[in-house]
């Protein structure tokens, strides 16, 4: 019985060695034909961490889970008219430039306001801008910029305005069923691999449409077919909520609006989280406002009555005065911002995504080590 078992083990070992040799030969041939790294074991990847770029909003970074937009992925931002979609995208442009990157803006709607973009912190002298004549031209320009590997962020505003050339050349009233959807589907197939390879973030802004005849469920949909929905790693639903009244002499005027941003799809962190931000007219997202709210909830900033204090020092009576204090003291702002990000694990050393991957890799290494020890003992 023992001889039969030993013989079976020898046959199994021989068969396993042959399979491994065949696999090694196949990998060598693939590497020779397609280059190093064409096929690799997941644990051998040099970069396992999900790299992100801040969205420019602390509340949105928290809602995204990983600390910002994932690099090398597609992001879709959609919502009703005047909800703040372009504002959210422009904050990402400003953040990319702040981090030393290059950003491009494909303005298919031909409606970008340079003065407003500059007010949000965008360096308009360095921003690459294209106003294409057709949808194919806009997507082709985006593709060439991404393929260059020199651009960190590409924003397309908007998918609904990417009109196929055949529709432009035709007459109003002509039927072009599915033409835009086919164009977007082809573009996604071509762009997705290049976006991932170059670690470019591609943000597509989209509008809303309503399905005709829907009596039950949500009648809202986004134009451009389903391809963008499938290829997007992150989808954000932006909705304006309540108006923000001014103070003092502006108390009878609306100076901004509270906006809800819901992460309806997320491939790098848990989805369905929500961020509430204040979009001030002419200024964009109030970074001081969201920081005060979040830090107060975490008791990093203490609130007693109408007074806000930090480290035992009063920083303002009422939120407006506290905002002004943080705006005038950027060092204090950065210090509080850092504490909030550490709390949510969004700093580079404390990223929840990184921690999980490192833990899994350590477990895998321990398992390999245990197997090696077991083989040595058996021999």
UniProtKB/Swiss-Prot annotation:
Keyword annotations of the record: ATP-binding, Cytoplasm, DNA damage, DNA recombination, DNA repair, DNA-binding, Nucleotide-binding, SOS response
Spans through the membrane: none
UniProt-recorded Gene Ontology molecular function terms: ATP binding; ATP hydrolysis activity; ATP-dependent DNA damage sensor activity; damaged DNA binding; single-stranded DNA binding
SUPFAM superfamilies registered for this protein in UniProt: P-loop containing nucleoside triphosphate hydrolases (SSF52540), RecA protein, C-terminal domain (SSF54752)
One family name in Pfam for this protein: RecA
Gene3D superfamilies xref list: P-loop containing nucleotide triphosphate hydrolases
InterPro entries recorded: AAA+_ATPase, DNA_recomb/repair_RecA, DNA_recomb/repair_RecA_CS, P-loop_NTPase, RecA-like_C, RecA-like_N, RecA_ATP-bd, RecA_C_sf
Domain of life: Bacteria
Function recorded in the entry: Can catalyze the hydrolysis of ATP in the presence of single-stranded DNA, the ATP-dependent uptake of single-stranded DNA by duplex DNA, and the ATP-dependent hybridization of homologous single-stranded DNAs. It interacts with LexA causing its activation and leading to its autocatalytic cleavage.
Protein name as it appears in the record: Protein RecA
Species this chain originates from: Streptococcus agalactiae serotype V (strain ATCC BAA-611 / 2603 V/R)
GN (gene name): recA
């Amino acid at each position: 019985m023992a001889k039969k078992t030993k013989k079976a083990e020898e046959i199994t070992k021989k068969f396993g060695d042959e399979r491994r040799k065949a696999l090694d030969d196949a990998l060598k041939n693939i590497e020779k034909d397609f280059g190093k790294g064409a096929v690799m074991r997941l644990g051998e990847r040099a970069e396992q961490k999900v790299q992100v770029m801040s969205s420019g909003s602390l509340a949105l970074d928290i809602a995204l889970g990983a600390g910002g937009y994932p690099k090398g992925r597609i992001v879709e931002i959609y919502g009703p008219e005047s909800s703040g979609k372009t504002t959210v995208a422009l904050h990402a442009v400003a953040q990319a430039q702040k981090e030393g990157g290059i950003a491009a803006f494909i303005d298919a709607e031909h409606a970008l306001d340079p003065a407003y973009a500059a007010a949000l912190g965008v360096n308009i002298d360095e921003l690459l801008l294209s106003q294409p004549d057709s949808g194919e031209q806009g997507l082709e320009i985006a593709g060439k910029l991404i393929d260059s590997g020199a651009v960190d962020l590409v924003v397309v505003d908007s998918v609904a305005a990417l009109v196929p050339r055949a529709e432009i050349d035709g007459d109003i009233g002509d039927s072009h069923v599915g033409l835009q959807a086919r164009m977007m589907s082809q573009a996604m197939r071509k762009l997705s691999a290049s976006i991932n390879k170059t670690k470019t973030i591609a943000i597509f802004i989209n509008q809303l449409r309503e399905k005709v005849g829907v009596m039950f469920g949500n009648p809202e949909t986004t134009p451009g077919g389903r391809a963008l929905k499938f290829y997007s790693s992150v989808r954000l639903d932006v909705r304006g909520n309540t108006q923000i009244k001014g103070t003092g002499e502006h108390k009878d005027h609306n100076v901004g609006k509270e906006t809800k941003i819901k992460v309806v799809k997320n491939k790098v962190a848990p989805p369905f989280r929500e961020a509430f931000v204040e979009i001030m007219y002419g200024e964009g997202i109030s970074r001081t406002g969201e920081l005060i709210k979040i830090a107060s909830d975490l008791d990093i900033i203490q609130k007693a009555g109408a007074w806000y204090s930090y480290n035992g020092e009063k920083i303002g009576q009422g939120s407006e005065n506290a905002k002004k204090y943080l705006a005038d003291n950027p060092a204090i702002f950065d210090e509080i911002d850092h504490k909030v990000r550490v709390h949510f694990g969004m700093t580079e050393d404390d990223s929840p995504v990184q921690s999980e991957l490192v833990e899994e890799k350590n477990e895998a290494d321990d398992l390999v080590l245990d197997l090696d020890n077991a083989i040595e003992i058996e021999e």
